[in-house]
Amino acid sequence: MTKDIFLTNNLNNKKEKFIPLDKKNIKMYVCGPTVYDDPHIGNARPLIVFDILFKLLKNTFSKVTYVRNITDIDDKIIKSSQEQKISTKELTNKVTSSFFEDCKFLNCENPTHQPKATEHIDLMIEMITQLIKKGFAYENNSHVYFEVKKLKNKKYHRYR
């Protein structure tokens, strides 16, 4: 007999029963660290929280696919690598290694997949281009933003 799982919905601050889209394969995606500097306590909190959720889901459902990305290219990384006079690759390898050591120290399980941003640049550019073409995103000062007012289910999203 499976126990129900209740999670807090941050949009209404109420506990709601977790109803999976696919009971045969629960899928969870978590934004991982941007590896520009040594890991800190702010990196540890989501590690621990989502590790507990991952373990709970694995004990409740037969299959759980957990994806946590590693952002290994962005403005902070470029700036930090320039300040340290090392390549972005050298910096991100060093910081990613420290992050993985912390994961191990905190007894966090490895996600099912851990993609790095640099492994998917072409796909990201393609997706961003499509979002802009369809009017769901726009560029401003070399940044791309979602056009959240175009979302159909506005009650499920917060925006200013």
Segments from the language model and where they lie:
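NTP-dependent nucleotidyl-transfer catalytic core
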Residues: M1-R160
